[in-house]
């Protein structure tokens, strides 16, 4: 009895009996962006902390399907609706945000300024509309979280954290292109005459803070843009240099609710290649960036099983697929890729990270956001092949797949990246660091709520 009482007095965090943290996670209304938050959210929950996820209503079902508590904020705006408004064509704004270029050769101030303008007007402001930010600030002031974790597009998160005094950190789902581009822009701006200096992102944040009776010094604005620290699951050698504290952790895949098909439980009789253009790309843009039926025909004579993720609409327009192609609407990547020898994909975060975690050579056909950069990084590391969409044809893809299956050096390089990811702490191992950093950065206002 005495031992039981002693254990109870210790509480969830050892002899000090510290109360659990309140942790608020937030994400734009896009499934794959949210999926990358789930393992960290559950690690915190399993450690005894209170966890809630705030997002626009379009994401509510996805959040609750992951077993976490959803708090709808804002209207029903979503990434899909925004893309529909611009005509379903990512080209106009993608050309202003070429991160493969940003992270390579030095840029002009004009290019960097244009990039910051495009990001604030076409990404940050639409994804963080006034109603979403208003509801987030009200939630933070009411619930008083100790820590706010936010994915890199969701600036409603740090704004809400600033409003209630919570600590806050970004949780990345890919290379830190936003903060890398920001650092380049600030260096270039510092060399300009005062009258030429503009900062669209800081201006937008400043207006938003003023609406809620908040002010912030320049240093605080930069902290809101980049987080008080950054959680980064990228393999160490692929990690971009960025200002501020970076806390690495191991990527753990989460693909939503799924059921394994019987065929996936059996060992393949020949090399298996995953061919996926990504569910998120199909859902977001309503079309494919590459002529998949021609590409599959070009792989038809390989002594390999090609598992292609195609929805019913794609299948109906593809005609008869080659005999070595297994066409499926959806299969969880965390279950499929461990059985594969190579993967062809669009550069999406979940697929790319899961492939890297499994040590697979990757053929990346990428056009959007940071995907061209990821393809270039993998090619430079010797762990993959990068193909620009405009240069893609059946012969080029076939050559890339053959190389991925036969090149032992590529397989070894992919294995090195896998080892880098496995060397980092799991989300469960990350929790003590989050507890320490939260105590360090929380300014006290988050503790001013009534007794729980």
From Swiss-Prot:
Residues 1-16 have a biased composition (Basic and acidic residues). InterPro entries: EryCIII-like_C, EryCIII-like_N, Glycosyl_450act, Glycosyltransferase_28, UDP_glucos_trans. One of its GO terms (biological process) is antibiotic biosynthetic process. It comes from the Bacteria. GO terms for molecular function: hexosyltransferase activity; UDP-glycosyltransferase activity. The keyword Transferase applies. CDD domains: GT1_Gtf-like (cd03784). Residues 1-20 are annotated as: Disordered. Pfam families: EryCIII-like_C (PF06722), EryCIII-like_N (PF21036). Keywords: Antibiotic biosynthesis, Glycosyltransferase, Transferase. It catalyses: tylactone + dTDP-alpha-D-mycaminose = 5-O-beta-D-mycaminosyltylactone + dTDP + H(+). Pathway: Antibiotic biosynthesis; tylosin biosynthesis. Its EC number is 2.4.1.316. The activity of TylM2 is substantially increased by the addition of the accessory protein TylM3. Belongs to the glycosyltransferase 28 family. Involved in the biosynthesis of the macrolide antibiotic tylosin derived from the polyketide lactone tylactone. Catalyzes the transfer of alpha-D-mycaminosyl from dTDP-alpha-D-mycaminose to the 5-hydroxyl group of tylactone to yield 5-O-mycaminosytylactone. It can also accept 16-membered tylactone and 12-membered ring macrolide. This is Tylactone mycaminosyltransferase. It comes from Streptomyces fradiae (Streptomyces roseoflavus).
């Amino acid at each position: 009895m005495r031992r039981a009482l002693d254990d109870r007095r210790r509480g969830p965090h050892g002899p000090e009996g510290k109360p659990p943290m309140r942790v608020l996670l937030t994400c734009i209304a896009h499934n794959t962006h949210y999926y990358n938050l789930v393992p960290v959210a559950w690690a915190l929950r399993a450690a005894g902390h209170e966890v809630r996820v705030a997002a626009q209503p379009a994401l509510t079902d996805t959040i609750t399907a992951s077993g976490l508590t959803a708090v709808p904020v804002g209207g029903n705006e979503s990434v899909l609706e925004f893309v529909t408004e611009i005509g379903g064509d990512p080209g106009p704004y993608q050309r202003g945000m070429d991160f493969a270029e940003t992270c390579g050769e030095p840029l002009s101030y004009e290019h960097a300024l244009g990039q910051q303008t495009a990001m604030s007007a076409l990404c940050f402001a639409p994804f963080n509309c006034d109603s979403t930010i208003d509801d987030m600030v009200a939630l933070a002031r009411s619930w008083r979280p100790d820590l706010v974790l936010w994915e890199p597009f969701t600036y409603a998160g740090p704004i809400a954290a600033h409003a209630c005094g919570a600590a806050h950190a970004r949780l990345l789902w890919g290379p830190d292109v936003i903060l890398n581009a920001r650092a380049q822009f600030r260096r270039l701006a510092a060399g300009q005459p005062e009258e030429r200096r503009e900062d669209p992102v800081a201006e937008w944040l400043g207006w938003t803070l003023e609406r809620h009776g908040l002010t912030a010094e320049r240093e605080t604005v930069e902290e809101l843009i980049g987080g008080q620290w950054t959680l980064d699951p990228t393999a160490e050698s692929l990690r971009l240099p960025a200002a501020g504290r970076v806390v690495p952790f191991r990527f753990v895949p989460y693909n939503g609710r799924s059921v394994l098909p019987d065929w996936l439980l059996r060992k393949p009789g020949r090399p298996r290649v995953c061919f996926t253009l990504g569910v998120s790309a199909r859902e977001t843009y309503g079309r494919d960036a590459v002529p998949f039926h021609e590409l599959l025909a070009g792989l038809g004579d390989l002594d390999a099983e090609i598992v292609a993720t195609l929805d019913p609409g794609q299948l109906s327009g593809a005609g008869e697929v080659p005999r070595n192609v297994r066409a499926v609407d959806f299969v969880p990547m965390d279950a499929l890729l461990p059985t594969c020898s190579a993967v062809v994909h669009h550069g999406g975060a979940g697929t790319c990270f899961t492939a890297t975690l499994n040590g697979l050579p990757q053929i990346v056909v990428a056009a959007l956001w940071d995907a061209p950069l990821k393809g270039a990084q993998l090619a430079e590391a010797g762990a993959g092949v990068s193909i620009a969409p405009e240069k893609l044809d059946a012969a080029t893809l076939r050559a890339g797949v053959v190389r991925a299956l036969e090149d032992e050096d590529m397989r070894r390089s992919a294995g090195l990246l896998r080892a880098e990811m496995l060397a980092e702490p799991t989300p469960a191992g990350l929790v003590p660091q989050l507890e320490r950093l939260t105590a360090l950065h929380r300014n006290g206002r988050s503790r001013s709520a009534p007794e729980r």
